[in-house]
Amino acid sequence: MQGMKKLFIETLGCAMNSRDSEHMIAELSEKEGYETTNDLSSADLIIINTCSVREKPVAKLFSELGVFNKRKKEGAKIGVCGCTASHLGEEIIKRAPYVSFVLGARNVSKISEVLHKERAVEIDINYDESEFAFNDFRTSPYKAYINISIGCDKSCTYCIVPKTRGEEISIPTELILREAQKAVKGGAKEIFLLGQNVNNYGRRFSGEHEKVSFSELLRRLSKIDALERIRFTSPHPFHMDDEFIEEFSSNPKICKSMHMPLQSGSSKVLKDMKRGYTKEWFLNRVQKLRAMSPDVSISTDIIVAFPGESDEDFEETLSIMREVKFDQIFSFKYSPRPETEAEHFTNIVDEDVASSRLTTLQNLAVNILDEKNKTHLGKIYRVYFEDLNQDYYASGRSDNNLLIKVKGSDELLGEFRDVKITDIGRTILSGEIVG
């Protein structure tokens, strides 16, 4: 649109940050007349939406800010949003005085307000956005990310999220259903539900609302006629009761892909982390899940070298990896975060030992993945296509979250096709359309 102001936004971290960025784009477009651009040097407003789960993204923030400040055009504003904004607040402006405003992860709806204030810092983690009606914007016309809760009530000793996103509040069911219906009317055939602990949905609402469990929410969403697929992240192993597993397994619209954040295979370490479950509970849930849904793919998160992790504890983690054979593993060395309980733990694992353990774990993960990928060769999967690259390969995901590409055109985008796997790679499978 002629004369519209330009917005450049970079998003770091999780899917919830991606959805927050979509919310900010919608607000700035509707209320302030901005349109997005991929050209930083032409932008009138530059936003970096940050992550603070580990130390590395925080360090990256100030590196990126320096680059942005050098490349921005005269008069352009720079804003810092998200979890690091919530955590560091005014310190960001002290360290980078060219930053125009700082907006916390719990205050996304105030983006237009802070934009017009000089060096504004808005980081109230108790601010309630659970009933705020955001204007609609989606980066993909084929899939809709939908928040079902904000914040987190867990007290994991390593995690800073409760300090940056506040207490957990469920978004009213009627708002979620309305957003899903609107997305489907707009052409989306898949919705992706977001929350820190999605299967704890319904525990607390900010107002008087019908108490609906996560399993019941899934049932209601699946009644939307043109909606074909439902995904979600992340469920907490502690809340994986039988009702949830049964609904997941029996509901044909729910994709058979589950992210189960293990964090450690040692019950002792899990207790130190205050995860709320044991190794035995986790394995029991996996066994129940696979008994009811044999083709389910299971991904996980693992932290190595948590304070006090012994060689025996680490071996227990490797053992559970061999037993479960996760389809994907996101693994990290423990990174102490400020204002967390574990920051004060003194039994720190030696850095060389930590690095060695991470390498060992990742090598095992690759071996497991390579073996599992071989089993896909020759099989047929129903793929929902969402992307087309410049070489005219269309890619999408199967029900169990395999990333699959075929030679094709934009006519495949937003469509389902049966694909026979003809070649396997570590991160993407290749195939040909059949039928």
Curated annotation (Swiss-Prot):
Coiled-coil zones: none
**Record-listed [4Fe-4S] cluster 1 binding positions:** C14, C51, C83
Catalysed reactions, semicolon-separated: N(6)-dimethylallyladenosine(37) in tRNA + (sulfur carrier)-SH + AH2 + 2 S-adenosyl-L-methionine = 2-methylsulfanyl-N(6)-dimethylallyladenosine(37) in tRNA + (sulfur carrier)-H + 5'-deoxyadenosine + L-methionine + A + S-adenosyl-L-homocysteine + 2 H(+)
MTTase N-terminal domain mapped to chain residues: 5-120
Q: Which domain of life is it from?
A: Bacteria
Gene3D superfamilies the record matches: Methylthiotransferase, N-terminal domain (3.40.50.12160), tm_1862 like domain (3.80.30.20)
Under the GO molecular function aspect, what terms does this record hold? 4 iron, 4 sulfur cluster binding; metal ion binding; N6-isopentenyladenosine methylthiotransferase activity
Q: What is its EC number?
A: 2.8.4.3
Q: Where is the TRAM domain?
A: 374-435
Textual note on the cofactor: Binds 2 [4Fe-4S] clusters. One cluster is coordinated with 3 cysteines and an exchangeable S-adenosyl-L-methionine.
PANTHER family reported for this sequence: CDK5 REGULATORY SUBUNIT-ASSOCIATED PROTEIN 1, MITOCHONDRIAL TRNA METHYLTHIOTRANSFERASE CDK5RAP1
Q: How does it assemble?
A: Monomer.
Family label: Belongs to the methylthiotransferase family. MiaB subfamily.
Question: What protein name is recorded for this chain?
Answer: tRNA-2-methylthio-N(6)-dimethylallyladenosine synthase
